[in-house]
Amino acid sequence: MTTAISDDLLGTAMVDFAAGRRSPLWLRVAPGRRLAHDLAAYFAPVTSHELALLDLAEGPVLDVGCGPARHARLLQTRGLTAIGLDRSLPAIDLARSLGLRRWLHADACSGPLPPARTALLLDGNLGLAGTPAGAAQLLHCLAMACGPGGRLLVSGRAPRHGRLRAMVIRDEYRDRAGPWERWLQAGLPAVLDLAAPAGWRLRYAATAGAEYWAALSLDTPW
């Protein structure tokens, strides 16, 4: 999930990157710090930590904030039904051009989601919810889609300080600046606290420095 189409600089930058038009995408963090946004990461091979996590997926799979859908497309090759979900139409179109077979151009909590067995919130995509309350709502929506025994695969990077970091950010690409938006960076303990009211329980976790990869399920043991 990214910004509205008229200001969808991330989606536009992804499309340009895939076509070989390599211009830097910047992430402006209020009140003024600017960071390079690594577009190559959206197209990188799946890592060993990600593979270990994706081995736990059961179909149908809902890939939330899929972007070019590198995880969903990998699961397709394993014979699983994988649905890419993104608010960015350019990202959805790009994922389709790269081979994604099923997609949904929508926000995860804007309406009923297709039934799923596994939901993906990888690459820190819980942050798309913007706030702790928004994250709790997103986790509830995914629990409703997955149902009893459903699985949630999450990865991200813990903040330098504390369990949660709420930020206001915007994308800057070429001569354009997107709208300011809320972003949430959550460490694994915070993710588990936010997920617990919806019934999600930790089943597997791995860490490497500040990065983490975790699998949760809805109450039913595996």
Residue ranges and their predicted role:
Residues 99-109:
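Conserved SAM-binding strand-loop segment of SAM-dependent methyltransferases
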